[in-house]
Amino acid sequence: MTSQQAQVAAAVTNAAAQSAFCGDYRWVARHLKDRDAERARCNSPDGGYTAVETVHFDRAEFTKQIQEFLDADVSDGFVIGLKRRREFALQLCHDYKKFTEAQRLELVLALAVDLGVRDLALMMKTLPSIKRSGLVLNVAAAALGFSRKNDPNISKSVKRGLVPLAEQFFLLIGTIQPGPLFLLNLRVDLGILIERHREKLPKSSVEALELLDLIMRDLFATQGSMRFRRIDLSSEDLAAFVLKNERVHQVRSWADLQRRLAGQQRYCFGLFHMHMPHAPLVFVQVVVTDHLCNSITPILEEETSPVKNPSHIIFYSVSTSNTGLRGLNIASHLLFLTIQRMTSMFPQCTTAATLSPVPGFARWFKAALANGDQQSQATSDAKNVLKNKQHIDPKMRLEPPERSFFTTEQAQLLTMKYGVNQLVLHKWLLKKISDPEWHKDMELVENIRDVMTAACARYILFARKQDKILDPVANFHLQNGAQVEQINFMADTTPSALTSALGMMVNYRYCMPSIDVTSLSYKRQSLAAVSPAAARLVWPTESVILDEIERLKDERNTPLFAKVFRAGEVISARGSLPKAIYFVASGRVRVQSAHPYNLCEGQTFGERESLNDEPVAFTVRAETVTHLLLLPYNDVKALQRESSALRDYVGSDPRVWQQQLYMSFHGSKL
């Protein structure tokens, strides 16, 4: 950091400190108590709705008023008409807080069904007879190829008629001070009401409510009234909001909140609606460091001195404050704005990455371990077959062993230390990590570190739901274009993190020069970008290609891509141009040559075609559900230009190195 940049950063921090208010443990306790009470109210059986009707709401009357305000001509003049509309909207926002669940359902049904999208015939009937006939003549003349002067008033009426009245109503609500928060809360209630009453309502009404939800989402996404700014201790309201709405790492004390908002090289930024200046829609917490952080504890619990040579911008918490924002990409927008702001403040920082939770890992891993005994038996049988063979015929139809969580060395170590039979290691590990105190056994922690880290990598990259990553945090960052950079064991040992993620956290790196490519690869082809170091966790086989990528990583970031292929799916077709080099991480593929043969985990294909620019020689198809790592063709060629070692690699007989790879991998796996 230059002296000028340091002075600017210090001035910003000092200015914030001078105007900051000073809280204490009582202030924190009071706001946390309010937060817990609000959450308890929302989670109550009645959903926090008012049980007794205290304000009147009539669906038919409401529908009629909206139609009069928005669809009919107003003869009182623009100013008076606008004033009446705004007063009506303000009264609704005020009354809605007291609505019962039944009244809220009536309101959304009025908006979705009674004021929903109208067909063209109904829209035409709303036009005066003269305008209607003029429009018909215009359309007929245009259809016959004649030009006819258009009436601007007719065009305006048609345009308004094509916009649902509910959407026009939302636009009106958005212009008043409490409007945006009302719309967010209305969308929260809409989602709850759809789920509660889905089976009771007619199918057409449910579809109309779901369409209304999409209209509200898209309307909020297109509004240009967002403001990006820093959050610090200069505003008590803002500090209290962060305290109550932090979703990832709960604030535990006043000192904790101080560190996050005003600590050395700590920053917090938010996106605000112009009508909600003290309630950010989403906020992110950032720390500047000189390394890729692998634990959340030092960030949350230690007051560090300024880093002399900062190189990394670490995002350790992203919190959305309102579930009415679901389906919107506001958090992504905030991340990119924050990267832009932080790199302008610290231009020497070359790496922007997250330290993120893995909320679904514990459930997935325990379920996998519960089914692990059959995998262990299959693996043991296959290993005995491999030991008795001096040569593996590529044409041999050998069923591959199921993927185990343990290498031979790890299994032997655990057997010697704990006296557990290798065939029941999965059951043994499941029992160990089900103990709430397991993380306090330091010897156990070290002995299972590699097992847990590799398992988490498999979960992050290959656990899918309809081609999308199962883990919601991973799915969010990969859609943004980030890559899985590093898997961290025992990175968060708080009770909640141990319960949901067994202490695992992941670094997702945002490499800005290639972020568009990685984002589109995931959205269009379900390719999850992963660093070579993290890729080795799911493909722990010696590889010249991976070695060369890592050797050149300081000059060029070259991620691999993880993809799941379904059984029977064609991976590469004979005669086509090469697309990638493929690494089989799990499963089995069939090479349909004159003498067909299988490739299993630990093996590769596509090298010769990609490196030599040859067409694909044989069709390769997934025989089972198969997990692959890909190095795209363009990256292969770029790597080839910079690495002479690849020429020797591709020059060998493919069957020889396929057999060597198979033996090197399966000889060390259960």
Predicted regions and their residues:
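A small-molecule sensor/coupling module
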Residues: 610, 615-621, 627, 633-670
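Short acidic, glycine-rich loop/turn motifs
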Residues: 273-277, 591-593, 622
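A generic structural signal for short coil/turn motifs at secondary-structure boundaries
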Residues: 323-327, 573, 608, 638-640
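Conserved beta-strand elements of beta-rich interaction domains across eukaryotes
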Residues: 276, 359, 513, 588-589, ...
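A conserved hydrophobic position in a structured secondary element of the catalytic/binding core
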Residues: 584, 600, 623, 631-632
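Extended, composition-driven regions rather than compact fold-specific motifs
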Residues: 2-547, 670
